[in-house]
From Swiss-Prot:
Region (Homomultimerization): 16-24
Keyword Ubl conjugation: no
Keywords for the protein's UniProt record, in alphabetical order: AIDS, Host cytoplasm, Host nucleus, mRNA transport, RNA-binding, Transport
Domain notes: The RNA-binding motif binds to the RRE, a stem-and-loop structure present in incompletely spliced viral pre-mRNAs. This region also contains the NLS which mediates nuclear localization. These overlapping functions prevent Rev bound to RRE from undesirable return to the nucleus. When Rev binds the RRE, the NLS becomes masked while the NES remains accessible.
InterPro entries associated with the record: REV_protein (IPR000625)
UniProt-recorded name of the protein: Protein Rev
Species, as recorded: Human immunodeficiency virus type 2 subtype A (isolate BEN)
Main location: host cell
Length: 103
């Protein structure tokens, strides 16, 4: 189950990176050579920042999973005493020959 959580965390990080990449399209459009060059430079800097962010996201370790001791403590905390019915107030009379066949 831990592997599934790790996989879901990684998929979330990849979705975030994909969204960031899609919001930073390659520059297109008319303009002078210097304008196009500056747009490409800006995009390159933005791309490098995105790569740095991706490295930080992947480098951050996931929070540690619960140790067996923590799980045992949580299990004990969830335990409750069940409501038991009240004991009978009057005891039935016992016969000495109860359960014996009469002869």
């Amino acid at each position: 189950m831990s592997e599934r959580a790790d996989e879901e965390g990684l998929q979330g990080k990849l979705r975030l990176l994909r969204l960031l990449h899609q919001t930073n399209p390659y520059p297109q459009g008319p303009g002078t050579a210097s304008q196009r060059r500056n747009r490409r430079r800006r995009r390159r800097r933005q791309w490098l920042r995105l790569v740095a962010l991706a490295n930080k996201l992947c480098a951050v370790p996931d929070p540690p999973t619960d140790s067996p001791l923590d799980r045992a403590i949580q299990h004990l905390q969830r335990l409750t005493i069940q409501e038991l019915p009240d004991p009978p107030t009057d005891l039935p009379e016992s016969n000495s020959n109860q359960g014996l066949a009469e002869t």
